[in-house]
Amino acid sequence: MKHNDKQEKLAKAFKALLKEERFGSQAEIVTALQEMGFENINQSKVSRMLSRFGAVRTRNAKMEMVYCLPVELGVPTTSSPLKNLVLDVDHNGALVVIHTSPGAAQLIARLLDSLGKAEGILGTIAGDDTIFITPTSDTDIEELYLSALELFEQTP
């Protein structure tokens, strides 16, 4: 089997495993891939693959921290369980701050950035579990705060 074919099969198997949203550690992924016949796989290869495919750690339906792939097509919507990843929304008169489950901030920020200036969002900065939302110059911060609360079905 050619090297490229092996790499393709490994990538396909890797993505399939992450879509199951049940692997909480790189060691678990290594074991699963080895059981699938990829005997030369190790933790460092899995780590590189996680980075290459943009995998993130987030909570699954059972509230376990697991590796998963970001949504590959389109921008996430609030009808998906993303709203469940938002823990708190607040503001200080200048910025709106959103606290999320660990690993979820960049995904939520992507959604907010897609709303853009029409919704009063100049831009976002996201870490692992915190997002800063900068309003446009003509946006009232209180209105942006209330919009964010409504978007993620939070109460003030």
Swiss-Prot record:
It is found in: Cytoplasm. One of its GO terms (cellular component) is cytoplasm. Pathway: Amino-acid biosynthesis; L-arginine biosynthesis [regulation]. Keywords: Amino-acid biosynthesis, Arginine biosynthesis, Cytoplasm, DNA-binding, Repressor, Transcription, Transcription regulation. GO terms for molecular function: arginine binding; DNA binding; DNA-binding transcription factor activity. Pfam families: Arg_repressor (PF01316), Arg_repressor_C (PF02863). The keyword Transcription applies. One of its GO terms (biological process) is L-arginine biosynthetic process. Its main location: cytoplasm. Belongs to the ArgR family. Regulates arginine biosynthesis genes. This is Arginine repressor. It comes from Aeromonas hydrophila subsp. hydrophila (strain ATCC 7966 / DSM 30187 / BCRC 13018 / CCUG 14551 / JCM 1027 / KCTC 2358 / NCIMB 9240 / NCTC 8049).
